């Protein structure tokens, strides 16, 4: 479990990026972490991974304080950063060097994912394209079988077929004992695989709930007439009419349009 209570964080003497920030994430969750540019998504992931220290409050991840960076904690956390560099090694050499750090590493799992991504152990990392290197990092991180998997913009650099592969591989690879945190601006890339959505804005959690509850509490539909859309909680004009969010009122559940819902939440906050 991830339990964040009343943390403060700022870079140098700048104003607080997070002030009195709290968030809880249960084991078995695949969380979509959403927010505008500069909202602090990457910083939050670094705090959870122990790459940055908090300045107040507490973060506890599966019983560990991340900033203490105990080896037993680090062995159970895998991070795929948005920006990365890899050494001039073969995949095989890279894996041989790093897999001893992860006691639950699965070599057979790695080989299976590499094959699905059309990568080979003798491939040279520095000769791969950016998208291929990203796919290798995804394969390695999933093969670590860490209890916490942190993915910062994992679909950046992937083409459309690779994004589909990523979704299928992720869903088939994780277990109910793991927590997966995915920060992204590409909402449509993850809306079919996450079960929980967290939205942060201005240093606060403005929404945290399961997609099941969102589907139960809100109705997503397309209206053809403006007067119908104007009665909704929120709407956006589109080529096929007006995409609307309304209160569910015990209606039949509808598919959650996560991008529309994110826009609704952030627009609502901007008016407060």
PLM region descriptions:
Residues 49:
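Helix-to-loop junction immediately C-terminal to a conserved catalytic motif
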Residues 165-245:
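ABC transporter nucleotide-binding domain
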Residues 149-153, 158:
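Catalytic Walker B motif of ABC-type/P-loop ATPase nucleotide-binding domains
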Residues 1-20, 27:
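A short, flexible loop at the N-terminus of ABC-type nucleotide-binding domains that lies
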Residues 79-136:
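ABC-family P-loop ATPase nucleotide-binding domains
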Residues 34-36:
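The feature captures the beta-strand-to-loop junction immediately N-terminal to the Walker
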Residues 57-68, 72-73:
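Conserved ABC transporter NBD signature motif
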């Amino acid at each position: 479990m991830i339990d964040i209570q009343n943390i403060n964080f700022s870079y140098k003497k700048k104003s607080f990026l997070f002030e009195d920030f709290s968030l809880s994430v249960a084991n078995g969750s695949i969380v979509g972490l959403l927010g505008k540019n500069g909202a602090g998504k990457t910083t939050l992931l670094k705090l959870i991974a122990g790459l940055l220290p908090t300045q107040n409050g507490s973060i506890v991840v599966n019983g560990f304080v991340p900033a203490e960076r105990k080896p037993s904690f680090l062995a159970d956390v895998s991070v795929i950063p948005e920006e990365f560099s890899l050494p001039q090694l073969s995949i095989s050499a890279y894996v041989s060097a790093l897999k001893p750090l992860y006691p639950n590493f699965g070599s057979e799992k790695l080989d299976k994912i590499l094959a699905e991504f059309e990568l080979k152990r003798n491939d040279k990392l520095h000769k791969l394209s950016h998208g291929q290197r990203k796919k290798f990092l995804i394969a390695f991180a999933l093969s670590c079988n860490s209890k916490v998997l942190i993915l910062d913009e994992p679909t950046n650099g992937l083409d459309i077929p690779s994004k589909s592969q990523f979704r299928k591989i992720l869903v088939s690879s994780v277990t109910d004992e793991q927590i997966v945190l995915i920060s992204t601006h590409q909402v449509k890339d993850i809306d079919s695989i996450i079960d929980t959505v967290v939205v942060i804005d201005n240093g606060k959690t403005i929404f945290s709930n399961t997609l099941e509850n969102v589907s139960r509490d809100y109705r997503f539909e397309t209206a053809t007439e403006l007067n119908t859309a104007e009665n909704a909680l929120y709407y956006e004009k589109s080529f096929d009419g007006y995409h609307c969010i309304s209160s569910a009122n015990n209606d039949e559940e509808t598919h959650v349009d996560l991008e529309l819902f994110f826009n609704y939440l952030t627009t609502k906050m901007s008016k407060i």
